[in-house]
UniProtKB/Swiss-Prot annotation:
EC numbers on record: 3.5.3.8
Cofactor: Mn(2+)
Stored Gene3D superfamilies: Ureohydrolase domain (3.40.800.10)
GO molecular function list: agmatinase activity; formimidoylglutamase activity; manganese ion binding
Binding-site residues for Mn(2+) 1, renumbered to this chain: H133, D162, D166, C253
GO biological process: L-histidine catabolic process to glutamate and formamide; L-histidine catabolic process to glutamate and formate; putrescine biosynthetic process from arginine, via agmatine
HAMAP family, alphabetized: Formimidoylglutam
Gene name linked to the record: hutG
The reaction(s) this protein catalyses: N-formimidoyl-L-glutamate + H2O = formamide + L-glutamate
Pfam family, one: Arginase
Biological function: Catalyzes the conversion of N-formimidoyl-L-glutamate to L-glutamate and formamide.
Taxonomic source organism: Aromatoleum aromaticum (strain DSM 19018 / LMG 30748 / EbN1)
Protein name in the entry: Formimidoylglutamase
Record pathway: Amino-acid degradation; L-histidine degradation into L-glutamate; L-glutamate from N-formimidoyl-L-glutamate (hydrolase route): step 1/1
UniProt keyword annotation of ATP-binding present: no
Length: 341
């Protein structure tokens, strides 16, 4: 590969096992830059933004998350049978604009939303690379525009693995408000707000937030109820939620995971959920055939000196892609729903 070719592929370069044969491939050898007429596949879309985290008085640095995720994904083993594309980053934010000069949170979210809509319209399954959890409001806006174009709009559900409800009330949107914003948008559209959160830390959510969650009909499990021994009960919660929806948006906030595994986030968990449990949730979500959109949020490389959080985030993206690749036909099966009575 020439130096020019390596530059064109950005972070997608790494080890090549030349003596291991044609099946010894890694992501950097297989991920393609997204072309307009590309066949349906998995599309990585970066959201290099932490403006919402800053507004929420969190620790900045998640804007560098997408770049760190791609670098870490590059050397993972490739087992895919469905294409994976890289669509670059929403907003095209440079380092000088991270303080919201030329780019505001709302313009970043608007660009991400438009690109999500376009990817869904083209038949792709987008996986967002965050960035702060303000990515969720952006993702929802793009997903909703796609959904309302269906002859019979689907019942959309959001499954969030997160230590926080992110239902805060604030003068302006931030990383702590996306699901309150989504609930309000559902009210405007006369849609039911279908939201399930796994990994809630009781010590990190005020009584007011629990009250709001219950008033909105949010399903949730506490982090202390999501150990390995609780996996059957967690799986039952997820399957019950999936039974009541047609399309799923899965969002994984890294602050739900044990702080020992994921220290590189704005607000590390003191107990958290083990990675194996999150992978089990991913398997169930994809196996339902209802997943249309996913993302991983809150990776902060500046707080991740040994890269363990980036490796875990990359593993979760890898798991998502691996499970989707095993059943692409099922993932696509719900895009045109029959009429319901």
């Amino acid at each position: 590969m020439s130096h020019k070719d390596e530059e064109d592929r950005g972070p997608w370069h790494g080890r090549i096992d030349v003596h291991e044969g044609p099946r010894a491939l890694r992501w950097h050898q297989c991920v393609k830059m997204l072309a307009p007429e590309a066949p349906p596949g998995i599309v990585l879309l970066g959201f290099p933004c932490d403006l919402g985290v800053r507004r929420n008085h969190g620790r900045a640095g998640a804007a560098e998350g997408p770049a760190a995720l791609r670098r870490t994904l590059a050397n993972l083993a490739w087992h895919g049978e469905w294409p994976v594309y890289d669509a670059g980053d929403a907003g095209d934010v440079g380092a000088s604009t991270h303080d919201a000069g030329e780019q505001t949170l709302e313009t970043m979210q608007g660009d991400y939303a438009r690109r999500i809509t376009a990817l869904l319209e083209a038949g792709h399954v987008p996986i967002g690379l965050g960035g702060g959890h303000e990515i969720a409001w952006a993702a929802w806006q793009g997903f909703a525009v796609h959904a309302i174009r269906e002859p019979h709009p689907p019942r959309i559900g959001i499954l969030n693995v997160d230590a926080h409800f992110d239902l805060r009330t604030a003068p302006a949107g931030n990383s702590g408000t996306p699901f309150r914003q989504i609930a309000a948008d559902c009210g405007v559209r006369d849609w039911n707000f279908r939201y399930c959160v796994l990994g809630i830390a009781e010590a990190a959510n005020t009584a007011a937030l629990f009250d709001r969650a219950r008033a909105l009909g949010v399903a949730f499990r506490l982090d202390e109820e999501m150990g390995a021994r609780d996996l059957d009960a967690t799986a039952s919660t997820v399957r019950d939620f999936l039974a009541g929806i047609d399309w799923l948006y899965l969002t994984l906030c890294l602050d739900a995971l044990s702080g020992a595994c994921a220290p590189g986030v704005s607000a590390p968990a003191t107990i958290g959920v083990e990675p194996a449990v999150v992978e089990a949730v991913i398997r169930i979500a994809v196996a339902s055939g209802k997943l249309r959109l996913a993302d991983v949020a809150e990776l902060n490389p500046s707080l991740d000196p040994d890269g363990r959080t980036a490796r875990l985030a990359a593993r979760l993206v890898w798991r998502l892609a691996r499970e989707i690749a095993r059943r692409p036909c099922d993932v696509r099966s719900g895009l045109h729903l029959p009429a319901r009575d």
